Amino acid sequence: MRVVDRGYNASTMKATRKLRSPRVLIVGCGDVGMRCVRQLQGRARLYALTSHAERRDELRAAGVTPIVGDLDVRASLARLAHLAPTVLHLAPPQKTGEVDTRTRALIATLTAPRVRRARHVATGRLRRAQHGIRARKTSSIVPDGGYPAPRAGHRPSRRSRVVYASTTGVYGDCAGAWLDETRPVAPANERAKRRVSAETQLRRAAARRAITASIARIPGIYAGNRLPLARLEKRTPALVDADDVYTNHIHADDLAAILLRMATHGRPSRVIHASDDTTLKMGEYFDRVADAFGIERAPRIARDDAEQQLGEMMLSFMRESRRLVNTRLKGELHVRLRYPSVDDFLRTVSKP
């Protein structure tokens, strides 16, 4: 890693300074997580939580120490406690409910007090003295308000720095308006409400100084292996221009670089739009991809027809229109994207 005066160039895939600790834990090490691994290769001790034991060999081959655990099973997460000061939380919430119980379990694990073994075996006299001290105390149960304030001069364990991969779906439909990170959230479905829940839990944990948290709100992720080619080949329709919605995008490699940049330079409790400069409607995006690969463009239908023909998941994206301002990304993190727009990436694609 090297320090540069003018910020971070994502095309080099190198952070501008070392992470505050060489140990990094990735929770949810899928496609984007593995891209983070490649960008950190040889510059940090990497750990990854996986719920799939069969992935252990793959992770080890990538230079990652696998930890088998499940965010839905709190007891399986014990090894994560105090493992790494830097945590990339890339795991999605569970599929039902409005509260993200997975993030709740992770925060509880990361903030669990250290358990230290006694150095000496107490003598009978010492045990009696300890018993007398305990007898003079009131209840030792920690109240709901949290743990007592540390004694003067006491140095608490170092807090975990958590970078959370959230979604721009927390804003709901904005009717195509431009918005920055100060826009109030208005989640329109349970999926987005769980993301708001995760953000809120992390902010509250940070407010009580249990962790340090930064939040990336992420739009549609694309890459060579994440393009809507199958959708185009199936001739799935898009909306006519009059009914179409604005979408936002980020290349997966640029996203990985942004997350790592946030781990070293992100302001505490700060939200960042991890978005490129693309301003396209959804159908226009599909057309650009189709043209780049020599595929026939998607047919267009009216919204009323789409409501009858398409599945609920796809429709949920077609009901929300917004355009993201990414000034913080550039002004605070000084990120220079490798692919500032979808078109910049598609120009690198060879037509068949």
Q: Model-derived features: where do they sit?
A:
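Amphipathic terminal alpha-helices
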Residues: 340-352
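Glycine/proline-rich active-site loop of Rossmann-fold NAD(P)-dependent oxidoreductases
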Residues: 196, 209, 221-233, 261-272, ...
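NAD(P)-dependent short-chain dehydrogenase/reductase
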Residues: 189, 203-247
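NAD(P)H-binding glycine-rich loop region in Rossmannoid oxidoreductase-like domains
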Residues: 51-109, 117-119, 123-128, 132-140, ...
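Conserved Rossmann-fold NAD(P)-dependent oxidoreductase catalytic core, especially the SDR/UDP-sugar
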Residues: 107-127, 134-144, 150-190
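Catalytic helix-loop patch of NAD(P)-dependent Rossmann-fold dehydrogenases
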Residues: 175-215
